[in-house]
Amino acid sequence: MAASMAHYQGHLSNRITTGRAETVGQAQYPPRRAERKYKLEVEQQPIRARMCGFGDKDRRPITPPPCIRLVVLDEMDRELDFNEIDSTYFVLMVDLWNESGQSAVNLVRHSSAAPTVSISSSTTTSYPPPPERSHYVATTIPGYDAHSQAYRHQQHQHQHQHQHMQPQPMAAAGYGPGAHTGVAVPPYYPPTPQPPTPTYQQYPAPAPAAPYGQAPAPSAMIPATPMSSNHTRNLIGMNAVNACRLNDTKNKPGFWFVLQDLSVRTEGTFRLKLFLFDIGAGDGTNATVAADGPTRGKGKCLAVNFSDPFTVYSAKKFPGVIESTPLSKCFAQQGIKIPIRKDGPKLPNQAEYDADD
């Protein structure tokens, strides 16, 4: 009994002096997130692309498609086996940066001269508001009831255009052929009670008429048009991708991020900035994710890296897409949607046809 007690005390003293008083056998479990290191290795760098312009459906993918391998290291800087990693909630985010990697160039000013017209502004332009007519008559004919005339104008707005050209009853009564030589005052019309608003009146109601002798306010004559932003995204396509479990050209399995659907609107030299996020909740293995899926809060950025500079050409200067690489063909055979150039004799402008595929 005494011998076994001494053996236990010696074993306990050894664990305390070596600093390993935690759970025995912890090394057999995956290390915690704080003890892991994550790296993004760009195994296939982007080289060139043709600018896609500002069309909504025009896409000119970057060639070759960037392929990024996820590397996870333990506390001893040893690469972990992919079987020990759950990449379910690992997400790669991509931004577009300048050649020097000093500033982001995700937004670009739209170069089109035609402004984008919203629905409200186009409706106002297609159907001129009644205040223009009422203000014009109110400032030229004294004693005229602008409110009643504006209502009559709205009431007959759906009739034929030749009915609008007929003289109004007031003009026929008070302004005959020789009326312009005198200072005759038109007869007084009693105010007409306002009926309920017609159901077809879906446009802004007429503004109140300005008093006689005063010019109407500019805001009453010309409806304000909201200013729309003329900036748009410079990098378009899938800029957030999940990790895929793929085998490389040496048949080595691993986790890869393939960016086969990225296009740039403008020409120039750029870099891709890559961010690795873990949107799961747990110890880095994503084994204790909540039942409702990924976290609703903030996701931790685990790694950041840049690609090599690549050039985006205009349509006239574009030398053609890059030949399909062995890595692209390898991933395409495993189900990744990468456009692969067909082998065989090349026809004139074959590069353009392949780029449109």
Curated annotation (Swiss-Prot):
<keyword id="KW-0804">Transcription</keyword>
<dbReference type="InterPro" id="IPR021740">
    <property type="entry name" value="Velvet"/>
</dbReference>
<comment type="subunit">
    <text>Component of the heterotrimeric velvet complex composed of LAE1, VEL1 and VEL2; VEL1A acting as a bridging protein between LAE1 and VEL2. Forms a heterodimeric complex with VOS1; the formation of the VEL2-VOS1 complex is light-dependent.</text>
</comment>
<keyword id="KW-0805">Transcription regulation</keyword>
<dbReference type="GO" id="GO:0030435">
    <property type="term" value="P:sporulation resulting in formation of a cellular spore"/>
</dbReference>
<comment type="similarity">
    <text>Belongs to the velvet family. VelB subfamily.</text>
</comment>
<comment type="function">
    <text>Component of the velvet transcription factor complex that controls sexual/asexual developmental ratio in response to light, promoting sexual development in the darkness while stimulating asexual sporulation under illumination. The velvet complex acts as a global regulator for secondary metabolite gene expression. Component of the VEL2-VOS1 heterodimeric complex that plays a dual role in activating genes associated with spore maturation and repressing certain development-associated genes.</text>
</comment>
<keyword id="KW-0749">Sporulation</keyword>
<dbReference type="InterPro" id="IPR037525">
    <property type="entry name" value="Velvet_dom"/>
</dbReference>
<protein>
    <recommendedName>
        <fullName>Velvet complex subunit 2</fullName>
    </recommendedName>
</protein>
<keyword id="KW-0539">Nucleus</keyword>
<feature type="domain" description="Velvet">
    <location>
        <begin position="32"/>
        <end position="341"/>
    </location>
</feature>
<dbReference type="InterPro" id="IPR038491">
    <property type="entry name" value="Velvet_dom_sf"/>
</dbReference>
<dbReference type="GO" id="GO:0005634">
    <property type="term" value="C:nucleus"/>
</dbReference>
<keyword id="KW-0963">Cytoplasm</keyword>
<dbReference type="GO" id="GO:0005737">
    <property type="term" value="C:cytoplasm"/>
</dbReference>
<dbReference type="Pfam" id="PF11754">
    <property type="entry name" value="Velvet"/>
</dbReference>
